[in-house]
């Protein structure tokens, strides 16, 4: 049917200029007009010249996020790096459901140790995670924070406590902080710091630049760890030119616009509060709290989630 055909595309919705894409996650307040102008001014050069290889691009990624070059690998979207990492991790992977499916989809099902929070809104704490996985011990543990799709958020100090538990138990911790810049503790809660990566050398931090920086068309993401052997493996596992020139140039110029980005994050949090209040006025939606750039809602009578999605598409061109 109509809606399923759109969903099979996974993007490319510029072909339908009347459509509003509320399916894929972006930042409406970044990149800033100044950054876009600089990209436009260099369009011809970037279109017609080769990008750099991994050495230069990992240097740029390290500069953007304040981590050592040998601790970070940039990818053609975080999805490219997730694929490599999921193939590399051995044994059981602890996953909290519902989750971003790209991680479990890259694993054999019987290698997953699944925790489903028994709460109405899928809320959970660091203690809940530690409690469950103390009894169902994985070799690696995935934490998406804020979580996707629930928007659940574990505060920074509790994430560090979870990292300490993993270190003591010999569990490798994978933290996906793709949405952390939308949280109320930003910018003080990132794990992309040399001292933290060195304190927890088995910890891996994933960040999709598409989501929070509003540039999904660039296909850009990073993975960081003080496990330099793992990072070196990931760098070799991707193709020689895994980033295009536009993605490289974005990293090259980003620090000039970092203040704009932080201002956009403040503006977004204000808009999220307003949007949640308005969304909560809709009688057939129960809106759950979120620290990300989306809300998980329970669809109530008279609609099912599918019926509502189809109606929004057919009557209002909203995906």
Model-derived regions: residue spans:
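Short loop-beta-helix segment that forms the pyridoxal 5′-phosphate
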Residues: 50-51, 62-84
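N-terminal "arm"/small-domain region of PLP-dependent enzymes with the aminotransferase-like
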Residues: 1-49, 136-137
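PLP-dependent aminotransferase-like
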Residues: 87-143
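Active-site pre-lysine segment of PLP-dependent enzymes
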Residues: 123-134, 149-173, 177-212
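PLP-dependent aminotransferase class I/II
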Residues: 53, 202-281, 285-288
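Short beta-strands and strand-loop turn motifs
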Residues: 113-115, 140-147, 174-177, 289-290
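Conserved PLP-binding catalytic core of the aspartate aminotransferase-like
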Residues: 269, 282-311, 315
């Amino acid at each position: 049917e109509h809606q399923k055909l759109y969903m099979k595309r996974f993007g490319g919705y510029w072909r339908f200029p009347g459509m509003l894409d509320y399916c894929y996650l972006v930042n409406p307040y970044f990149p800033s007009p100044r950054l876009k102008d600089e990209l436009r001014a260099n369009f011809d050069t970037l279109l017609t010249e080769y990008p750099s290889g991994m050495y230069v691009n990992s240097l740029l990624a390290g500069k953007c996020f304040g981590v050592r070059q040998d601790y970070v690998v940039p990818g053609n979207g975080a999805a490219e790096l997730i694929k490599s990492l999921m193939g590399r991790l051995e044994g059981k992977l602890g996953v909290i459901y519902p989750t971003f499916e790209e991680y479990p989809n890259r694993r054999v099902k019987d290698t997953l140790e699944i925790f489903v929070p028994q709460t109405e809104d899928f809320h959970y704490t660091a203690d809940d995670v530690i409690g469950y996985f103390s009894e169902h011990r994985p070799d690696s543990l995935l934490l998406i924070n804020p979580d996707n799709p629930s928007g659940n958020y574990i505060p920074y100090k509790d994430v560090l406590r979870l990292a300490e538990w993993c270190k003591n138990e010999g569990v490798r911790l994978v933290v996906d902080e793709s949405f952390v810049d939308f949280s109320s503790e930003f910018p003080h809660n990132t794990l992309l710091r040399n001292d933290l990566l060195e304190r927890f050398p088995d910890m891996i931090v994933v960040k999709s630049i598409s989501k929070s920086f509003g540039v999904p068309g660039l296909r850009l993401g990073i993975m960081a760890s003080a496990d330099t052997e793992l990072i070196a493996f990931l760098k070799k596992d991707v193709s020689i030119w895994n980033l295009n020139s536009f993605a490289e140039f974005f990293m090259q110029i980003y620090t000039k616009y970092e203040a704009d980005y932080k201002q956009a994050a403040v503006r977004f949090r204000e808009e999220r509060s307003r949007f949640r209040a308005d969304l909560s006025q809709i009688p057939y939606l129960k809106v759950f709290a979120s620290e990300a750039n989306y809300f998980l809602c329970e669809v109530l009578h008279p609609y099912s989630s599918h019926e509502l999605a189809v109606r929004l598409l057919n009557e209002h061109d909203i995906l």
